[in-house]
């Protein structure tokens, strides 16, 4: 096992990191089922925001703690001086709303009329133990903690200078107030503890040198603090028109008819929301327990593509390119990231140590998607609508590929010693889910930091959250007073 982990590590990784990788890898394989993935579903690529991180990064199915060094990751005379990471929480339980819909669906199955030679799938589901409870309500599961510990170990091995023992007390952590994010940040710190102290049990997060994460919902849940978004999108009954239209469209009706026949229930007792929660239950059982749920047997790949598109439509219109405010509401977070990078540049120019070499921010898919949209990523030529499912089969915007559980967007700032000019001293790379993300303005894997700032000048200088998020004032005439 140690040889397997070592073969993926750069030569600069300390032996302690290798030992930690081996120990955590051993723990990972013993603690949860399904790691060899004999139960991996053919439906896994279509689970959208409920996708396991390892399904978006298949090399982790072989060894979940071995870092994969992207060949385009900058090396040589350029040294990383700061890392700013935006991280989605790890695998979670379904929400109470989803669990109640699942109970409703199971109730339909248990009261259906049994038929001779009936569906074995329906019979299996009627007997399927419903182990989800309302108390779970989106909380982080043990697999989600493992997602975070393993991510911490891989990043520490990939950037050993930044995650050095000396920098530990200078780590800066920010989190959403949601328990799944707070718990994810704590699990990440536990993974770092394993990196620094292989084999020793981690202390309580409050006792760690770097201190507990700081809650900042204005950054991590900016959408809750943007009145224009809340008015125009969140509370607007017509904002998700294309989502609702697709639910009653021909593609979804075909799935509905097929599922009703499989479950042996009247078609009018089902709707798109119940079908979707059944599909997600397949994903939850796989992600949380590593088991093949009988709910997976209800669907085939054609059904999965339709249900993935339904989920992507919601993400597109509520969190991405559907409405301008979706992305513009994240300006404050984007600017905050560049404030950290600017400060690191300034400190290096003054030959001072970088005060915050690693900044870790824990949020949601709803945090990452608007920011990536603001930066211009995963934008298709035509918008996703209720009526172009077939045309969008090869779309860029697939939420499961972009923001699975534990997804991460990482900004890495480098200082290059042999630069030909002052502008070339500082270069930057972006990583999405540990893979180099080409810069939007050049499609290159690395670029000058100042060039990136120039490309995003409008957002950095002109996007003011107070103005962007202010709903338009009502035009009241004197006759209306």
From Swiss-Prot:
One of its GO terms (molecular function) is bisphosphoglycerate 3-phosphatase activity. Its EC number is 3.1.3.62, 3.1.3.80. It catalyses: 1D-myo-inositol hexakisphosphate + H2O = 1D-myo-inositol 1,2,4,5,6-pentakisphosphate + phosphate; 1D-myo-inositol 1,2,4,5,6-pentakisphosphate + H2O = 1D-myo-inositol 1,2,5,6-tetrakisphosphate + phosphate; 1D-myo-inositol 1,2,5,6-tetrakisphosphate + H2O = 1D-myo-inositol 1,2,6-trisphosphate + phosphate; 1D-myo-inositol 1,2,6-trisphosphate + H2O = 1D-myo-inositol 1,2-bisphosphate + phosphate. InterPro entries: His_Pase_clade-2 (IPR000560), His_PPase_superfam (IPR029033), Histidine_acid_Pase_euk (IPR016274). GO terms for biological process: intracellular monoatomic cation homeostasis. Disruption phenotype: Knockout mice are born at Mendelian ratio and are fertile. Although brain histology does not identify major differences in cerebellar or cerebral cortex architecture, a mild, but significant 10% decrease in the brain weight was identified associated with a reduced cortical thickness in homozygous mutant mice at postnatal day 21. At 14.5 dpc, neural progenitors show a decrease of about one third in intracellular free Ca(2+) levels compared to wild-type progenitors. Normal chondrocyte differentiation and bone development are observed. A motif (Prevents secretion from ER) lies at residues 478-481. GO terms for cellular component: endoplasmic reticulum lumen; extracellular space; plasma membrane. The keyword Hydrolase applies. The active site is at residue 89. Widely expressed with highest levels in kidney, intestine, thymus and liver. It is found in: Endoplasmic reticulum lumen; Secreted; Cell membrane. Its main location: endoplasmic reticulum. SUPFAM superfamilies: Phosphoglycerate mutase-like. Glycans are attached at residues 236, 475. Residues 1-30 form the signal peptide. Keywords: Cell membrane, Endoplasmic reticulum, Glycoprotein, Hydrolase, Membrane, Secreted, Signal. Multiple inositol polyphosphate phosphatase that hydrolyzes 1D-myo-inositol 1,3,4,5,6-pentakisphosphate (InsP5[2OH]) and 1D-myo-inositol hexakisphosphate (InsP6) to a range of less phosphorylated inositol phosphates. This regulates the availability of these various small molecule second messengers and metal chelators which control many aspects of cell physiology. Has a weak in vitro activity towards 1D-myo-inositol 1,4,5-trisphosphate which is unlikely to be physiologically relevant. Belongs to the histidine acid phosphatase family. MINPP1 subfamily. This is Multiple inositol polyphosphate phosphatase 1. The lineage of its organism: Eukaryota, Metazoa, Chordata, Craniata, Vertebrata. The gene is Minpp1.
């Amino acid at each position: 096992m140690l040889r397997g982990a070592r073969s993926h590590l750069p030569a600069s990784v300390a032996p302690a990191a290798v030992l930690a990788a081996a120990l955590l890898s051993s723990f990972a394989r013993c603690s949860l089922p399904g790691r060899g993935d004999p139960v991996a579903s053919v439906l896994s690529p279509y689970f959208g925001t409920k996708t396991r991180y390892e399904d978006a990064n298949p090399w982790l199915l072989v060894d979940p703690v071995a870092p994969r060094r992207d060949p385009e990751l900058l090396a040589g005379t350029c040294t990383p001086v700061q890392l700013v990471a935006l991280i989605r929480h790890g695998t979670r339980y379904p929400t109470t709303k989803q669990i109640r819909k699942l109970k409703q669906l199971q109730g339909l199955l248990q009261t259906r009329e049994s038929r001779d030679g009936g569906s074995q799938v329906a019979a299996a589901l009627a007997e399927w133990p419903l182990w989800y409870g309302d108390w779970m309500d989106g909380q982080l599961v043990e697999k989600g903690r493992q997602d975070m510990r393993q991510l911490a170990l891989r990043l520490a091995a990939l950037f050993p200078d930044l995650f050095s023992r000396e920098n530990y007390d200078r780590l800066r952590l920010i989190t959403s107030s949601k328990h799944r994010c707070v718990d994810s940040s704590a699990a990440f710190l536990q993974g770092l503890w394993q990196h620094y102290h292989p084999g020793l049990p981690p202390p309580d997060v409050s006792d760690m040198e770097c201190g507990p994460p700081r809650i900042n919902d204005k950054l991590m849940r900016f959408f809750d603090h943007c009145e224009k978004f809340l008015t125009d999108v969140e509370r607007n009954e017509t904002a998700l028109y294309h989502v609702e239209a697709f639910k009653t469209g021909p593609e979804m009706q075909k799935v509905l008819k097929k599922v009703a026949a499989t479950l042996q229930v009247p078609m009018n007792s089902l709707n798109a929301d119940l079908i979707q929660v059944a599909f997600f239950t397949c994903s939850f059982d796989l992600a949380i327990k590593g088991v093949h749920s009988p709910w997976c047997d209800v669907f085939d790949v054609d059904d999965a593509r339709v249900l993935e598109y339904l989920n992507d439509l919601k993400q597109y219109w509520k969190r991405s390119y559907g409405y301008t405010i979706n992305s513009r509401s994240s300006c404050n977070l984007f600017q905050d990231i560049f404030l950290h990078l600017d400060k690191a540049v300034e400190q290096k120019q003054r030959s001072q140590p970088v005060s915050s070499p690693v900044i870790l921010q824990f949020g949601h898919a709803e945090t990452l998607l608007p920011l990536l949209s603001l930066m211009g990523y995963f934008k298709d030529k035509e918008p996703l609508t209720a009526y172009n499912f077939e045309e969008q089969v090869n779309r860029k915007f697939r939420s499961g590929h972009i923001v699975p559980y534990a997804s991460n967007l990482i900004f890495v700032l480098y200082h290059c010693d042999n630069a030909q000019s002052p502008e070339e001293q500082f270069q930057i790379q972006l990583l999405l889910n540990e893979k180099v993300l080409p810069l939007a303005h050049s499609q290159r894997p690395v670029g000058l930091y100042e060039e990136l700032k120039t490309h995003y000048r409008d957002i950095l200088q002109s996007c003011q959250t107070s103005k962007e998020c202010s709903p338009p004032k009502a035009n009241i005439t004197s006759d209306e007073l």
